[in-house]
Amino acid sequence: MSRFSKILFTASLISLFLCMTALAGNWEKDDKGWRYLENGSPVYNCWKTDTNGDYFWLGPDGYMVIGAYVDDGRYVDSTGRMVKNRWVQINGKWHYFEQSGREIQGTKKQISGLWYYFDYDGTMVTGWYNDGNNWVYCDENAGGHMLVSCWKKLEPAQDMTIDKNAFDENDGTYWFYFQNTGYVTRATDSDFKDYAIGGVHYAFDQNGIMQTGWVKISDTQPVIAGYRFYNNDKSLGTFGAAHVGWLSAYPPSEISSTGDVQWYYFDNKGVPAYGTRVPSNDGTYALEANFKKITKNNVTYTYLFTEQGNPVYGLVQVRKTDGSFTSMYFGTKNQSCLQKATNIIEGDGTQWLYGFNNQGYGITGASNGYLYYKGKAQRAVDDKLSYYTVNGNTYLVNNAGYIIKNYNKSKAPGTVEYKSDAAGMKDGGTAATSVLLQPEYQEQE
């Protein structure tokens, strides 16, 4: 028996007993029912009270009416009493009558701390209801009150347009969240909207259906910046919540890639890390030196991300905050974090000597006996010695990249001469300066 049924049954028993004892004085009962006499004659079409102050309606035949609407929408129950401040089930539908006996119609009403909606005929609304501003849901299984501040998995309203193909698994029900106003949480000015609920971010479409997987929240550049990933499996965390931390997944279909699974990193609001690509001074491109430091097991690692939102690996060209360009090394694809190795594998597969400063930036200039350009050691390639000009200074280096100081010898009688001073800079030699050896950068997948 439902809450309302128990109330109705109990009230009927009590009222029946009271009716038999309280109707006295001018009240008279015969085989047809109760009448009220004034000066010995019955009254018609009016209200009269008993000794308890309860109101009863006398119909056109003078007899007390029971279980019916009377007098401009008021209702009398099975004992004849006017219903006030309580629920009544009429023809299988629930109705509520106020202190005045008036029925609640065409509005919402807070009753015992809970909100209810009523149709214009006074019937309590159950299921989905649109009040002209937004959708609410009145849960018949919870007494018919409007849901507030809670999740509910439901079939959508008939007026909602659902793209069932957008869901990998669909049993006809979807998750909705109802705010403290009772309104369903939904996107209003875009296809999808991200909302924080209890400090956790979720995405909803224009119907209010919770989304999972990749969801495009906004149009922005780079494209990945407008996406979030909402957990589509409980193994990833709270189902439907914006993913936080590392994630291995296929990229959004809008983003061109090799089609392989990629790594992504999301902050505590679900925003993916991404990089900014800029033209470089050598006709190629570089990434802005905007790093992401991530701590794991008390160790902090430095990452740089592509415009597609993937951590870079290998040798990468970056633009520093001062506008200059240089190289950085982020290890193997399995590492994909800043490394300070010296003998590294370049993008073309060649092993080469590199030099990096304490921040991981490739050195340009002389350092520790070697000459570097964007971190790459400059060395003689076609000869044992070569001149290279870096930062306006021309140095003499051997085929190991080491700066040769105080050198003053001819290669052979009558051939080109190499000569350097105490700093290893060119000092009168006649050999031509070689073209700088450029780093071979890793192409990011």
Stretch-by-stretch model annotation:
Residues S2-E445:
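Extracellular adhesion/carbohydrate-binding repeat motifs centered on closely spaced tryptophans
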